[in-house]
């Protein structure tokens, strides 16, 4: 089963862990991405996320299909992404994957966060302390980013 959600509400890590847990599984692996208070010497106050929601959910479903093709023993996949304002220390993304043994779930979680950042249309703006400046961030993994194009043959 896939448990996918984009929400403006605070993410509940424990609830997603419980959702993906399964009696046939000895492992639930989690990734929790949180807002940190700094970036390149600037003090970060909060993040703001926007998404092309219909396309994001569609892409997340395709990502789940790819995970299941690579790790056939994966049972449940949960991907919850926050939208709107996310203060420092709060979760912006939670990925939880269950499998009978830890190797598959650990590898699948690592793959999922990397692919999520590459392909799912969610955008992040950092707001900085001081003069109220902000900056839209570009993931270097994202295939349409300049950083990606500079480092890959297209």
Curated annotation (Swiss-Prot):
InterPro entries: MoaE_sf, MOCS2B_euk, Mopterin_biosynth_MoaE. The keyword Iron-sulfur does not apply. Keywords: Cytoplasm, Molybdenum cofactor biosynthesis, Transferase. Pathway: Cofactor biosynthesis; molybdopterin biosynthesis. It is found in: Cytoplasm. One of its GO terms (cellular component) is cytosol. GO terms for molecular function: molybdopterin synthase activity. Catalytic subunit of the molybdopterin synthase complex, a complex that catalyzes the conversion of precursor Z into molybdopterin. Acts by mediating the incorporation of 2 sulfur atoms from thiocarboxylated MOCS2A into precursor Z to generate a dithiolene group. This is Molybdopterin synthase catalytic subunit. It comes from Anopheles gambiae. The lineage of its organism: Eukaryota, Metazoa, Ecdysozoa, Arthropoda, Hexapoda. The gene is Mocs2.
């Amino acid at each position: 089963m896939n448990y996918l959600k984009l929400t403006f509400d605070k993410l509940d890590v424990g609830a997603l862990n419980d959702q993906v847990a399964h009696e046939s599984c000895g492992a639930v692996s989690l990734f929790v991405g949180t807002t940190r208070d700094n970036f390149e010497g600037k003090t970060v106050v909060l993040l703001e996320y926007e998404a092309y929601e219909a396309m994001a959910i569609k892409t997340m479903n395709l990502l789940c299909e790819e995970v299941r093709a690579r790790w056939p023993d994966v049972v449940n996949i949960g991907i919850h992404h926050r939208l709107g304002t996310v203060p420092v220390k709060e979760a912006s993304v939670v990925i939880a994957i269950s499998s009978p043994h830890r190797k598959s779930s650990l590898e699948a979680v690592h793959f999922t966060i990397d692919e999520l950042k590459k392909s799912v249309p969610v955008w992040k703006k950092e707001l900085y302390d001081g003069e109220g400046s902000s900056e839209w961030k570009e993931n270097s993994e994202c295939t349409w980013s300049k950083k990606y194009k500079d480092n890959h043959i297209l």
